[in-house]
Amino acid sequence: MPRFPRTLPRLTAVLLLACTAFSAAAHGNHTHWGYTGHDSPESWGNLSEEFRLCSTGKNQSPVNITETVSGKLPAIKVNYKPSMVDVENNGHTIQVNYPEGGNTLTVNGRTYTLKQFHFHVPSENQIKGRTFPMEAHFVHLDENKQPLVLAVLYEAGKTNGRLSSIWNVMPMTAGKVKLNQPFDASTLLPKRLKYYRFAGSLTTPPCTEGVSWLVLKTYDHIDQAQAEKFTRAVGSENNRPVQPLNARVVIE
């Protein structure tokens, strides 16, 4: 099923770093970047020395998953629970923040704590050249601050009621609100957690590498009105183009 047609102008994305909770905190910079014009993804590597990896990195994300290598990938064990969260419009995405721990994902004997999840419209990763209407990134860190991103792709379809509590309160300008009841992130994951795995990077500046990527094979759905509301809130589509795989291998 094709992605939704563009119905909104690509406006200049506003300043505010933090599409991933740890990137802005770790680098402490305030360089303007966005998805359109002079601040677009093609220019990120030239905006700041700290962003240089966006241009020079060899293990960048997102990617187009075409050829894969079969492997006995370990099962993902998710231990998410209802938690109080903030819903933030940081100018680049709508992000749901987890101020406290307690939500974890374990894979291959290593446990990662969920820090936040956010969305990209349209998707950043592709499957055999196919772009999806939306993608969610569940961002985790292990005890050594090593990042893992669990990605869910959304097809065009009917309204996704499981997103309603977030979509109903999402700030339409920069800012954040607290949900008035606990939110269980596991409701946004499919029952089957089969996945593709590859080494990659943050998909936003500073494009730090060393990120473990798990892209789920089972898709969710979203309707056009939900996608359009997101794009209005953020001010533009917010997907980085796919990057070369180079010597990397995608395992499934």
UniProtKB/Swiss-Prot annotation:
Ranges for domain Alpha-carbonic anhydrase: 31-252
Disulfide bond positions: 54-207
Annotated binding of substrate, by residue: 203-204
Keyword terms, alphabetized: Disulfide bond, Lyase, Metal-binding, Periplasm, Signal, Zinc
GO-annotated molecular function: carbonate dehydratase activity; zinc ion binding
Function comment: Reversible hydration of carbon dioxide.
Necessary cofactors: Zn(2+)
EC number: 4.2.1.1
Source species: Neisseria gonorrhoeae
GO cellular component: periplasmic space
PROSITE patterns documented for this protein: ALPHA_CA_1, ALPHA_CA_2
Protein name per its UniProtKB record: Carbonic anhydrase
